[in-house]
Swiss-Prot record:
It comes from Homo sapiens. It is found in: Postsynaptic density; Cytoplasm. The gene is FAM81A. Facilitates the interaction and assembly of proteins within the postsynaptic density by promoting the condensation of postsynaptic proteins via liquid-liquid phase separation. Required for neuronal activity. Accumulation at the postsynaptic density results in enlargement of dendritic spines. GO terms for molecular function: molecular condensate scaffold activity. Its main location: other. The keyword Oxidoreductase does not apply. InterPro entries: FAM81. One of its GO terms (cellular component) is glutamatergic synapse. It comes from the Eukaryota. Keywords: Coiled coil, Cytoplasm, Synapse. Belongs to the FAM81 family. This is Protein FAM81A. Residues 78-110, 161-192, 236-290 form a coiled coil.
């Protein structure tokens, strides 16, 4: 019965398993009652056997006493004891019967509760079975629908497979055509590469020839520039020496004139100084013009040197040479400027000395 109950509990849904705890307790009580009944039956059987043994002993003793004689008193005592034992056994049996009746009533009540619980469980199981049957029916319907969909999808897959095979054939033909076109293009590319390689070789030869020409031209320009720089330096040195000589001569002449003609005025000296400064300005303008001419010539050569990409290195060298030339000209200008400052300072000192001498020469004339 317990195994059947467990099977029912396993087949029940989850929401009804909480109600199966009461039948478990009732089953345990029934088992306890059955165990107690078995114990009482064993005790009663033992008591009955003990009573029958006493009875047999009494009968045997009475028979012995009758055979011997004078055993009425002992027989009576044995009978009284036997009656007491029987009455005690009967009382014990009555009490046990009452207890068993109460336990049977409780068992009947428990069995009634278990039966009602089992009926409710059976009803719930029937309802669960109905739900399961409905679910099974729905599952059968969904399976039928899925089988129909599977059939349609299988047919669609077959159709797609056929289309794929047709498309594969078309693609293979197109791939073959493309491979033929690619081979033609590769042949054309090879031809163009060979033509370009020949052109590059020719252009390389031309560029080497042009580089040689540019190298010779650059060497010529460098030599010309170096010659011009040397000539300019020599000319500047000559001019500087000539100007220094002229200035010294004029200073000497002025000192002689001052010594000879003490009555000369300062206006003549200023005119002469202004003429000398104008002459110096003319000399500087001439030098600037020569420098500007050389600069324009270098720029023209630089513009002609930027014709091709291969002339970049040559242009860099030209720039370096130009920087050197500019540095040389700037040094020349600085030397000319410093010389001019020295000459102006010297002229100023000479003029101050002349003015002092004139003042000294004019002072003795005033008291006379």
């Amino acid at each position: 019965m317990e195994n059947m109950h467990l099977r029912r509990v396993r087949t029940m849904p989850r929401h009804s398993q909480s109600l199966t705890m009461a039948p478990y307790s009732s089953v345990s009580l029934v088992e306890q009652l059955e165990d107690r009944i078995l114990c009482h039956e064993k005790t009663t059987a033992a008591l009955v056997e003990h009573a029958f043994r006493i009875k047999d002993d009494i009968v045997n003793s009475l028979q012995k006493m009758q055979n011997k004689g004078g055993g009425d008193r002992l027989a009576r005592l044995f009978l009284e004891e036997h009656i007491r034992n029987i009455t005690a056994i009967v009382k014990q049996l009555n009490r046990d019967i009452e207890v068993l009746q109460e336990q049977i009533r409780a068992r009947d009540n428990i069995s009634y509760g278990t039966n009602s619980a089992l009926k409710t469980l059976e009803m719930r199981q029937l309802s669960g079975l109905g739900d399961l049957r409905g679910r099974v029916a729905r599952c059968d319907a969904s399976i039928a629908r899925l089988s129909a969909e599977h059939k349609t999808t299988y047919e669609g897959l077959q159709h797609l497979n056929k289309e794929q095979q047709a498309a594969k054939l078309i693609l293979e033909t197109k791939i073959k055509d493309a491979e033929g076109q690619i081979s033609q293009l590769l042949n054309r590319v090879d031809l163009s590469i060979s033509e370009q390689s020949t052109k590059l070789k020719m252009s390389h030869r031309d560029s080497n020839h042009q580089l040689q020409l540019l190298d010779t031209k650059f060497k010529g320009t460098v030599e010309e520039l170096s010659n011009q720089i040397l000539s300019a330096r020599s000319w500047l040195q000559q001019e500087q020496e000539r100007i220094e000589k002229e200035l010294l001569q004029k200073i000497d002449q002025l000192s002689l004139i001052v010594k000879e003609n003490s009555g000369a005025s300062e206006r003549d000296m200023e005119k002469k100084l202004s003429q000398m400064s104008a002459r110096l300005d003319k000399i500087e303008e001439g030098q600037k013009k020569t420098f500007d001419g050389q600069r324009t010539r270098q720029e023209e050569e630089k513009m002609h040197g930027r014709i091709t990409k291969l002339e970049l290195q040559m242009n860099q060298n030209i720039k370096e040479m130009k920087a050197e030339v500019n540095a040389g000209f700037t040094a020349v200008y600085e030397s000319i400027g410093s010389l001019r400052q020295v000459l102006e300072a010297k002229m100023k000192l000479d003029r101050d000395q002349l003015q002092k001498q004139i003042q000294l020469m004019q002072k003795p004339e005033t008291p006379m």
